[in-house]
Amino acid sequence: TLLLNNALFELYSFLRSSDKIGACGGNLYDEDNKPTTSFSRKYPSFFWELLSIMYISPISLSHPRSIFFNVSNKPIRVASIVGADLMVRKSVLSQVGAFAPEFFMNYEETELCHRIHKAKFDIYSVPLAKITHLEGRASYIKQSRLYFLYEGQYIYFRKVYGIFGCRLIFAITQLKSYIRILQFLLLGSPERRSYWKMKLETNRKVWNSEKIKRILK
């Protein structure tokens, strides 16, 4: 992570501007200085996952130019900030707690932001803070990273929606993979079909892991 300007000062100043602000983050750019995912406008849910199966994203309809990046040149309220530039008020951390130790790589900032919102604090995207996030932008997620992505997803849904919610999101995720495998078989795209088969197998492997079995008890 590299600072493109006085980003820390911009975030710190904004955080101190109101006691109602619990956390904030800036705009992230990739290594080619192109905008990349900086925040999320909604929290993960069964509804959004089901819509994604049909390639439907209501957020992209309401915010076609700024789904995950702030192009407004002014602070906007969001659901969660990417962990690479998440700044949280110390008193808020004392109240809601820090990152949950169950997470390894993914969803830990999402779950923390969810707790911050439940405590009645706002979270903002501050575009004046500009930061380079040195992370790969490959179209296909590597299997090793995908494993921890699924693991984080199940831990998040277990914490937020309970055991039933965790089982339901597994079923939806598997359904999506089966549909994509059939879709790309019919479209004659063996590479994409193999990728989704890998996702299906990785998801099943995560679900059957000892860590996930423990959180389902």
Where are these regions (language model features)?
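A short, conserved alpha-helix in the catalytic core of glycosyltransferases
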Residues: V71-N73, R77-A98, E102-K130
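Basic/Trp-rich segment in TM-proximal cytosolic loops or flexible interdomain/linker regions
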Residues: S60-F68, Y154-L175
